């Protein structure tokens, strides 16, 4: 019953035929790359290092791409060799997935539950459900769970945790309330004169970035970890950004 409800809720939510649980978000990306038979994969420099690690584990060639001023992947910088693009909606700011129609697209929705049309323009949706994520089920960091939503009838579920599935089904009902709470919290900062990056765009407010003095930017850009790629926009942001966690 719980399993059937989980598949129905999350496959519909992400505009896919199937939704299954995996061990964590990194595993979800690894599995998505295998489903799509990806070989040359673009991903933004500004995202969690586990996204890059999933690419390396899957044996694909990664292309680390600069971001725009809102810290979402700059579609115009994607190399012609690429067949697949991993698109996270960083900090809950909606990336332009619709513009990627010429590629296979893995949409990372770990930080953006509550935004419109999630999964509508991508081939596969993944989401981490571990600590600090929008869908935080309170499990440990390594095995906190992940969702992969797809259209492949041949994909075999590698993990099913009824406790996590039940929590996610319950959280689905709370999405409007959680989103409203996050937006209200972000509005307090905006009203206090803090200029949050991406505040003029659709935003699910997992975290908010602004120009500040604390220099607590939450991710090391991937091109610093995996040299050979030029990302001047993100480089220009180094040591200039601060961030706020926005929780209900």
Role assignments for model-derived ranges:
Residues 42, 63, 106-108, 126, ...:
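Structural detector of well-ordered beta-strand residues that form the stable sheet scaffold
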Residues 10, 28, 41, 59, ...:
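Generic structural signal for small/hydrophobic residues in well-ordered secondary structure
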Residues 8-31, 43-44, 66-67:
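Short loop-beta-helix segment that forms the pyridoxal 5′-phosphate
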Residues 68-154:
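Active-site phosphate-binding strand-loop segment of PLP-dependent enzymes
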Residues 1-8:
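A structural motif shared across PLP-dependent enzymes of the aminotransferase-like
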Residues 32-79:
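Conserved PLP-anchoring active-site segment centered on the Schiff-base-forming lysine
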Residues 8-17, 25, 86-87, 152-248:
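PLP-dependent aminotransferase class I/II
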Residues 15-17, 34-40, 79-84, 98-105, ...:
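Short glycine/proline-enriched coil/turn segments at helix->beta-strand junctions
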